[in-house]
């Protein structure tokens, strides 16, 4: 791609005629103007010799050999196959949820047969959301059209013949399997839906799990090539009241003019709370002619580094070293830099009945309390030398190599009270907690 305007084109697939250009249900609107792909080719590209075959049934997931035979015959006489495949309206619409991510089997069967002919196969895929793409290796090119609106056929032709250069990027991750998605363990549920991802939504989940994906968040190709270089920060050390200016250069190293979406992520956040590996904090689109370089600029502030702290009722940026990452997708990071953040606010420390003995030992007022409780509880002491001997002695089968002192330091205050035989009451626990929070 792109193809010449004089190509012999075999357009195959019912979705080339009955185009899914919008959603169903309450989202359905009447278009002001709409043409299918065959009409666009006939009216706007008179030199293109186009044929059409339905190829598969849309209402039923059955292989129709008559449809298939016509499609294969047309494809054999063509220079390029334009195969329109995707989710029929009956498989994906308002009012019900999908139970799988598969495309209809009859469409995949036809793709395999078309690929066996040895002709270039360009797939235009129509879906409202990600689907499994284990069949994608059979296609020479794949355009994820989603439901692209009433002008989708015009856009398809412009992309096919090079009047437009693709520059879109995926706004979601396409997984390799339904079982890889975070909702797969709890969906479907009756009456309730539990969103268990927390802050690990979308690409954040797949990154944290270090899980391979079919196509990552932010992915998208072009007919030209792009080089990222010269990442620079205006400061190496900032406070959470400052802004940070990030710049980098983007060069079109290919042979066609085009647009590139540059993505900026912030990663390696300090681990005071569970955080994603990285998060998108900005993106911009630039146009470059072949050989041209453009400088792109991003401005980051406190929110770019922060998480919402429930106790503070505000966004909080922890002190520490963060990574600034520039890339073409969430899995294609081209440039990296680091910046040191200094928080100007101190998180108010609060304690409850689950405060551990180890935490109490870090407080001057708590050390005497802990020592008194440990003495009263009379935990047996095991020296480090003895503990190591028992851990490594294969003949010692007695399970006594536990470091009781370490176990005691991890014990919550309320559990010490439970195990004290009445020596420490719940009232005593409340008194200690109240004193800690003064």
Task: For the regions a language model picked out, list residue spans one by one.
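C-terminal non-catalytic regions of proteins with extracellular/luminal or membrane-system context
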Residues: 1-438
């Amino acid at each position: 791609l792109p193809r010449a305007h004089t190509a012999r084109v075999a357009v195959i697939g019912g979705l080339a005629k009955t185009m899914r250009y919008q959603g169903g249900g309450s989202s359905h609107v009447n278009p002001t103007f709409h043409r299918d792909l065959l009409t666009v080719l006939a009216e706007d590209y008179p030199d293109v010799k186009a044929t059409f075959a339905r190829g598969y049934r849309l209402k039923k997931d059955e292989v129709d050999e008559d449809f298939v035979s016509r499609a294969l015959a047309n494809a054999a006489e063509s220079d390029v196959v334009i195969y329109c495949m995707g989710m029929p309206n009956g498989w994906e619409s308002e009012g019900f949820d999908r139970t799988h991510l598969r495309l209809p089997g009859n469409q995949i069967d036809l793709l395999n047969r078309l690929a066996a002919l040895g002709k270039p196969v360009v797939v235009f895929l129509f879906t409202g959301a990600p689907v499994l793409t284990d069949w994608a290796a059979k296609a020479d090119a794949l355009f994820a059209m989603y439901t692209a609106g009433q002008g989708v056929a015009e856009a398809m032709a412009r992309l096919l013949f090079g009047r437009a250069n693709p520059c879109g990027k995926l706004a979601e991750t396409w997984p390799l399997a339904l079982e890889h998605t975070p909702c797969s363990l709890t969906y479907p549920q009756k009456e309730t839906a539990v969103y268990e991802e927390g802050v690990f939504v979308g690409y954040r989940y797949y990154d944290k799990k270090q899980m391979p994906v079919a196509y990552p968040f932010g992915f998208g190709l072009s007919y030209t090539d792009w080089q990222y270089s010269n990442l620079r920060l205006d400061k190496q050390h900032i406070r959470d009241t400052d802004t940070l200016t990030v710049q980098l250069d983007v060069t079109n190293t290919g042979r066609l003019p085009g647009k590139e979406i540059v993505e900026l992520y912030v990663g390696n956040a300090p681990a005071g709370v569970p955080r994603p590996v990285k998060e998108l904090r900005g993106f911009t689109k630039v146009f470059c002619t072949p050989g041209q370089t453009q400088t792109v600029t991003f401005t980051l502030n406190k929110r770019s580094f922060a998480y919402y702290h429930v106790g503070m009722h505000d966004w909080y940026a922890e002190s520490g070293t963060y990574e600034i990452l520039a890339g073409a997708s969430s899995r294609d990071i081209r440039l990296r830099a680091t910046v040191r953040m200094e928080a100007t606010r101190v998180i108010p420390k609060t304690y409850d009945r689950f405060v551990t003995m180890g935490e109490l030992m870090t407080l001057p007022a708590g050390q005497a309390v802990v020592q008194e409780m440990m003495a009263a509880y009379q935990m047996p002491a095991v020296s480090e030398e003895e503990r190591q001997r028992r851990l490594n002695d294969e003949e010692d089968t007695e399970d006594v190599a536990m470091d009781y002192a370490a176990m005691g330091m991890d014990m919550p205050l309320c559990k010490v009270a439970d195990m004290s035989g009445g020596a420490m009451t719940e009232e005593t626990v409340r008194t200690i907690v109240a004193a800690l929070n003064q």
